[in-house]
């Protein structure tokens, strides 16, 4: 169930402050965050936000199509290495 429109999008306060400071100064430094639950808002456009995936911070450049989505959607947490091919030669017996 999506969030109620009257509540507005959720963005962690510390992340919003960092974005506002950079917007007022006109700088575009990488912002490191652990807040995967924060919603991408139009104020973040053009910024690079390093989102934590549980192991490292993945840099995510915010574009117009990302507005309304969560930051965690752009930093995958699981790596799929593929299924191991069955070796028929070792199954003799």
Swiss-Prot record:
Transmembrane segments: none annotated. GO terms for molecular function: rRNA binding; structural constituent of ribosome. One of its GO terms (biological process) is ribosomal small subunit assembly. Keywords: Ribonucleoprotein, Ribosomal protein, RNA-binding, rRNA-binding. The keyword Aminoacyl-tRNA synthetase does not apply. InterPro entries: Ribosomal_uS19 (IPR002222), Ribosomal_uS19_bac-type (IPR005732), Ribosomal_uS19_CS (IPR020934), Ribosomal_uS19_SF (IPR023575). PROSITE patterns: RIBOSOMAL_S19. The keyword Metal-binding does not apply. GO terms for cellular component: cytoplasm; small ribosomal subunit. HAMAP family: Ribosomal_uS19. Protein S19 forms a complex with S13 that binds strongly to the 16S ribosomal RNA. Belongs to the universal ribosomal protein uS19 family. This is Small ribosomal subunit protein uS19. It comes from Frankia alni (strain DSM 45986 / CECT 9034 / ACN14a). The lineage of its organism: Bacteria, Bacillati, Actinomycetota, Actinomycetes, Frankiales.
């Amino acid at each position: 169930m999506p969030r109620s429109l009257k509540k507005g999008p959720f963005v962690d306060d510390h992340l919003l402050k960092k974005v506002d400071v950079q917007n007022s100064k006109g700088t575009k430094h990488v912002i490191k965050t652990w807040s995967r639950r924060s919603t991408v808002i139009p104020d973040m456009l053009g910024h690079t936000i390093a989102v934590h995936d549980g192991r490292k911070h993945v840099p995510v450049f915010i574009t117009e199509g990302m507005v309304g989505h969560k930051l965690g959607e752009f930093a995958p947490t699981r790596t799929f290495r593929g299924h191991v091919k069955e070796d028929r030669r070792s199954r003799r017996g």
